[in-house]
Amino acid sequence: MYNQYQQQPQQPQQFGGQQQFNAQPQSTGYGNFYQQQVPTQGQQQQFSGFQTFSNAGALNQQPTGFSQQTQAQPQQPQQQQPQSQPQQGMQQPFGNQQQQMPLTQQLTGFNSMMPQTSFGQPQQQMPMNTSFNQGMSTTAVNAPTGPLQPQQTGFYSQQQPLEPLKPTATGFINSFANTGVDNTLKIPAIRLSFITTQDQAKFEKLFRSVVTPGSNTITGDQCRNILVKSGLQPHQLAKIWTLSDTNKAGVLLFPEFALAMYLVNSVLQGDSIPYELDSRTKAEVSSFVDAINFSVSNDSEVEQKPKTPFDDLTAGISMMQPQPTGYMPQLSFGSQPQQMQQQQQQQQQQPQQQSFQGLTQQPTGGYGAAPQTSFGNTSQALQPQSTGFMPQNSFNQPLNAQTTGGFSSVLNIPPPGSMPQTSFTQQAPMQTSLATGGGFLQPQATGYLPPSNFQATAPLQAQKTGFGNNDLYTSANLASKFIARKEEAITPEEKSLFYKIFETYDVEKTGNLDSATAVEIFRKSGLNRSDLEHIWNLCDTNNSGNLNKQEFALGMHLVYRRLNGEVLPNTLPPSLIPSSTKILNTVKDQLKQGVDKNNRQPTKEDGLRFRNNDDELLPSSRNRRKTIDQSKKVNENKEKIENLKNLIREKKELLASEKLRLENDSQRKQSENADLLRSIENLKSQIQALPSTSKKSPSANNAVPHDLQSRFDTLTARIPNLFKEISDVSKELVSSQLALHHLKVDHPIRGSGPNCKITELDCKNARQRLTLTAGMCTLVGRPEPNYDNLEAQAQHFNEGIETIEKDDQKNQSAINNISTWIQEISSSVQAIIHGRTPSMGLEMDKWESGIGLEPEVRDFIISWKNRRNFDNSSYNTAGYSNGIQISSSATYRNNARAPEEKDSYSSFQTPEERSAYVKEQAKKKMEEKLAALGIKKKSGSSQSSPNPPQLTQQQQPQQQQQQQQQQQQQQQQQPNYYQQPSQPAAAVNNSNLPKANDDDDEDEEDEEERRLLEQLEKLKLKKKQEKEARLAAKRQTSSSPAETKNDNGHDSWDDEPTPTNPTGNQSQAGSHHQYNPFGKSEATQQKPASGAGTPQLNNTPTGGRNPFFKQAPSQSSSFDLKAAEQQRRVQRGLDDSDGWSDDDETEKVNTTANKAVDVSSTAVPATSTASVPVAPSLPQISATTQEQSSVAVPIAPPLPLVKSESSLIPPPPPLPTSITEGSGAPPVPIAPPLPQINSDVAPAVPVAAPLLKVGGTATLAENEEPKPDDASDVLSIPESVASDEEDKFHTPGAEDVSVAPTGAIPPAPPAPPVPVIPPPPPMP
């Protein structure tokens, strides 16, 4: 039957106040190490009735049983009290009791009592509280008059033989059976503050049920199976796992598992998952994990002792003493047979039935009026004494007090003849009804019920009995529960409060409180000095004089504990020791132990010095035969190695496949990039292949006639001027109307507003003036002026002005509408004619100038535009070059008329031509400025006077005839590949021709340049005439050809040495200096000079003209010291020429021509080479021409005469020329023919006379001393008119070659820079 009393809360034992009854308490439990024999007096005087029941509340609690050591049976007193009460409830009248002997307290219970006894129930004699009818208050309880009956004890020598132990169906619930919980797992008893005690116990039980035996961690799969039942999202569980797995080991220890469960519960309650754990929680979990790790390491170091079947009986109880033999240990917790219990009850109640007859029966065992007893354990009912009545040999012998339930250090041996109390059994319920006085008491069902895991609905099961086989009563369970109950820890609420107090006083945030501050805080509690010193000694664990946060919290906990009346412990329990101190002490112990273990003596021979001992002929048994375990381990290791190898191989394959994929991707990207680049190049080629707009008709729309386009452009250009005139007329009209309005309305106030409006300030000032005038008139006696309607007049005046302004605004709006309408019409017409509108400006600027595009696209657009300009210029100059080749005379005439036809902006008829002209001029100016800065060479423009030299009538026929002969000779003698550069050379446009009369469109800078150039020309002409006069005098006085050597400030390879005897290496040395970069600028300018007679060319090799080449010995001395010195100065850059003077070059031309006339051919070496074809002879040129030209404008010298019988060497290819500053016509790009020489001698190398180059450096005569005025050519010329001729050693180009004009070339746009033509092959 289910016991209704087992669910009642335990009532405080109120019957412990023995002072009122002069009764001594029963000494029970473990608490007494020695028991004193105290004489009992309380049982001689008994109180009757219920007169002392009101004082029951003052009775103190009796320490009974083992209730202070076990937690597994907390409710057993309540369960046992009602069970045994009905048995003692049968009270008999004590009317016939004759002996009233004082009962003496009996010492029951022995050291051999096992913990498996009745807890808190002293099974001793039962004092009865009776009342007498006569009013007397005496007690006759347990004073039997008959013989004592044998008591049921635990001796083997029972009078009645004991039955063997049998399984008894007692109704106990097997709650402690093994349900899969791993109780062997050792988890330190550390309290986690962030979860409650109940949650920690639940999590620990769940952890033990899941953990694998032999391990202290749960795997990720096991944890996942638990956490997924919460219903959270996978990403939330993943984040919880990341926070919980503090060691990143992939497994969870118990504190980490508890943390994970705490986070899951927090999320389920609506909280969010923290991004990172707070420091407090992290520290607690970390310290718990460290404690587990240290405990595991300590347990592994402790040597395991062999286990015995009796270990579980003594686990956790250190006070167990060896038991005396001869006694049967009480194994049954209240499982005696009911028959024996009934017999014992009958035997115990026999003396009570022989009591006094006059005693009135008292109801005992009830709840309503429980009599006062001196041995009461509860406030509910009297406790029966099952075996506490010691049988005596004589009736009058007092009973001795018995100690029950304790293990005493001194064994109290009872008097001889006494039977020791061994049965602390729980009595079975009486199945019979109570006799008297307890009719209202019902029989209670017995059965021990564990209070912790009781399930009321579970079926009753039979319990195992016997010695040491019932795991329900194992001491391990009892001890672990007892320890858990005794553990005292600081609650999280206390910790948080104490930590806040600590942080409040720790103003410096050092983590420590000094002794003065901490003691002052503790002193506020009001405790005495001794308690405070005790608390300080307990909390200052490391004896540092300061307290950290954990030590301060411990001290505050001890302070509050002492204030609550508890006793301070002498030493801290493990649960109160701060975790930091525990970890520090553990580390210290491990270090100490590690030092002792590391001091092992090394073996005599280690593995490195091992040598096989061949004396051992017989192998050891271990090597001959392997055990099964070793083979399994080897196989497992092999399997692990194979698995690792497989994993490595798989990873390698994955890496190889990944690398292959990356390579394929890179190759694919490269191929795609290559395809994109090819497509881009194709687009570029397609764009470049598009026809240029300049090659088309001047108009984008061929259907529109040219005259209509010109008319439209003219009208469009007149529109802005017309609107400007309209605006001016409108302004004049408004001003006239305002003036007329002022004349009509004669108002005395002059307005200061717009259009002379009268403002309020004007009226105010006028009113003040009128007031002053009126005052003056009053003083002088004059009549005051009448200005009453001043405001009305001002308003009328302003209205007239406003009317004029409104009319003007209407007119302006009408004009604006007309302008907008005209612009719309002109835009549509312009779109039809030119293919674009002004609104396309931004887009055109973007794609024409590359604005807002990528750098690559912008560079391509710029390069394409440059190439398009080059193609356009080539296209425009094609017709002009053809015209030059047709007729030289017509070309000259056209060239003569060109400045007159193309000299101004207005001479162009179409807008395209005018825009091309403007662009051409702008490009020329830009190139000139860039050339002045040294950024880029000029492509064809120079900065001398734009006026071409005017030739006399006598020079024109001769020059024309010479040009025709040179062209014919060039066409006959030159190979085809030499004729290729002739067209671009002849097609060089005369870009400077329109510059003579472009004053209308040039700015002030161009005007200043032209003025400077004119002054420069005048100075040069003056100097040139003076020097020519001096040179003519020198030529007349010169006696030898060597004296006419030209010292022009440059290299002397133009100079003609005197005839010398040829040597064998002259023909080879002739081409020695042709690739010298320092001489190309002058070597390319050699042209035939004109003389008085037919000149004879010298066959001296060119090696003689090289200053670095040793001069061949000659018959007459041809070395000129001054010329050599001047040459060296030129090479070193020390000459005085600044490259501006034009007369120097002219002088050089004249002197070279005279020198070429005077030089005669000398002997040549006999080793001649193959002859070359002979060119036709050229006509002789009279000397008067040279004389006139030397004084007048310089011209190109005539070619020398050659003999008909001499063989000619093929002339070098013509070099491209360009227009220089002093030339008005393009130069002739042909070289003069070489003179014929005899077939028996080596052909002489022709020495070409220098071409006419205006602006070259001045030349001096051979023996002429440099004068001071020679260095005065350096003029202060701005950089914008600087020339490139200062670069004396640059690679010669087309702009460095200049000849006299031979014909007129029609003007054309400037050509791009012509590439440098390679020099001719060496002479044979």
Swiss-Prot record:
Main location: membrane
Coiled coil: 622-690, 999-1036
Extent of Pro residues compositional bias: 1226-1235, 1304-1324
Pfam families to which the protein is assigned, alphabetical: EH
Region ranges (Disordered): 1-98, 299-427, 593-634, 891-923, 935-1175, 1201-1240, 1259-1324
Biased composition (Polar residues): 55-67, 371-411, 1061-1074, 1082-1103
Localization: Cell membrane; Endosome membrane; Cytoplasm, Cytoskeleton, Actin patch
Record keywords, A-Z: Actin-binding, Calcium, Cell membrane, Coiled coil, Cytoplasm, Cytoskeleton, Endocytosis, Endosome, Membrane, Metal-binding, Repeat
Annotated GO CC locations: actin cortical patch; endosome membrane; plasma membrane
Superkingdom in the source lineage: Eukaryota
Biased composition (Basic and acidic residues): 593-614, 911-923, 1009-1031, 1122-1135
Keyword flag Transcription regulation: no
One MF annotation (Gene Ontology) recorded for this entry: calcium ion binding
Cross-referenced SUPFAM superfamilies: EF-hand
Topology of the protein relative to the lipid bilayer: Peripheral membrane protein
Record keyword Repeat present: yes
Function statement: Component of the PAN1 actin cytoskeleton-regulatory complex required for the internalization of endosomes during actin-coupled endocytosis. The complex links the site of endocytosis to the cell membrane-associated actin cytoskeleton. Mediates uptake of external molecules and vacuolar degradation of plasma membrane proteins. Plays a role in the proper organization of the cell membrane-associated actin cytoskeleton and promotes its destabilization.
Annotated protein name in UniProt: Actin cytoskeleton-regulatory complex protein PAN1
Species of provenance: Kluyveromyces lactis (strain ATCC 8585 / CBS 2359 / DSM 70799 / NBRC 1267 / NRRL Y-1140 / WM37)
